[in-house]
């Protein structure tokens, strides 16, 4: 797994509401979260597909 995928989800201090995806190392899945727009980390992807590709998630049912 890419090291960025092990980072915790960070919403950040700003108040924007961007739908993003992050890799949840507990569930071993990419999950949606709302990103505030600043102060995040590299575990922050624009699409579910990008998150799964970078973090090596095997999608169920595909």
Swiss-Prot record:
SMART domains, A to Z: KU
Keywords: Disulfide bond, Nematocyst, Protease inhibitor, Secreted, Serine protease inhibitor
Keyword presence, Glycoprotein: no
UniProt cross-references to CDD domains, sorted A to Z: Kunitz_actitoxin-like
Subcellular location: Secreted; Nematocyst
Domain BPTI/Kunitz inhibitor residue range list: 5-55
Gene3D superfamilies: Pancreatic trypsin inhibitor Kunitz domain (4.10.410.10)
Name of the featured protein: KappaPI-actitoxin-Avd3a
Source species of the chain: Anemonia sulcata
């Amino acid at each position: 797994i890419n090291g960025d995928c092990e980072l915790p989800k960070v919403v950040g201090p700003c108040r924007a509401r961007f739908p993003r995806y992050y890799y949840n190392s507990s569930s071993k899945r990419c999950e949606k979260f709302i990103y505030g727009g600043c102060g995040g980390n590299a575990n922050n992807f624009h699409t579910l597909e990008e998150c799964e590709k970078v973090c090596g998630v095997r999608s169920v049912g595909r």
